Amino acid sequence: MAPAWSFLLALLLLSCNAICSLGCHLPHTHSLPNRRVLTLLRQLRRVSPSSCLQDRNDFAFPQEALGGSQLQKAQAISVLHEVTQHTFQLFSTEGSAAAWDESLLDKLRAALDQQLTDLQACLRQEEGLRGAPLLKEDASLAVRKYFHRLTLYLREKRHNPCAWEVVRAEVMRAFSSSTNLQERFRRKD
């Protein structure tokens, strides 16, 4: 009887360890892939930003969604997921395929897809712990509206190279802000 209990206890401890290792220590696990996305976005640049100054636009990036002092780690994961998901969708359009080097674009989408998978696992875990959706509707809506403005801008500019350059720079700004958010949580941990 004792060996059976020992075996069950060992199995329980191993499964707890496996589950906890899937635990979302996002600031530690997400930062490196996020930097990879930033690197790929930099490499996508085809047009000099200085030649596109007349095309710049204020898209009203929802900084409060990523930088609010009241933002909890679980909500931050949701915001990061939302930003990553919309970025993936933006760079998966037909217009993006025409604007960028296909090989780099494939690498970017693969990196974003991996981030989405990791973030989704974190979201499921956090929602399981809390039993409720993590992202406040206003933060989610702010991120969606921001990416909608980017999409409308591209359509208005007929997906020209400068418009894509402006959008690429905007997305880099969003990912830089999310990296800063992760650093803030890393310092807290």
From Swiss-Prot:
Residues 1-23 form the signal peptide. Keywords: Antiviral defense, Cytokine, Disulfide bond, Secreted, Signal. One of its GO terms (molecular function) is cytokine activity. The keyword Kinase does not apply. The keyword Cell inner membrane does not apply. Produced by macrophages, IFN-alpha have antiviral activities. Interferon stimulates the production of two enzymes: a protein kinase and an oligoadenylate synthetase. It comes from the Eukaryota. Belongs to the alpha/beta interferon family. GO terms for biological process: adaptive immune response; B cell activation involved in immune response; defense response to virus; humoral immune response; natural killer cell activation involved in immune response; positive regulation of biosynthetic process; response to exogenous dsRNA; T cell activation involved in immune response. PROSITE patterns: INTERFERON_A_B_D. One of its GO terms (cellular component) is extracellular space. Coiled coil: none annotated. This is Interferon alpha-H. It is found in: Secreted. SUPFAM superfamilies: 4-helical cytokines. Disulfide bonds join C24-C122, C52-C162. It comes from Bos taurus.
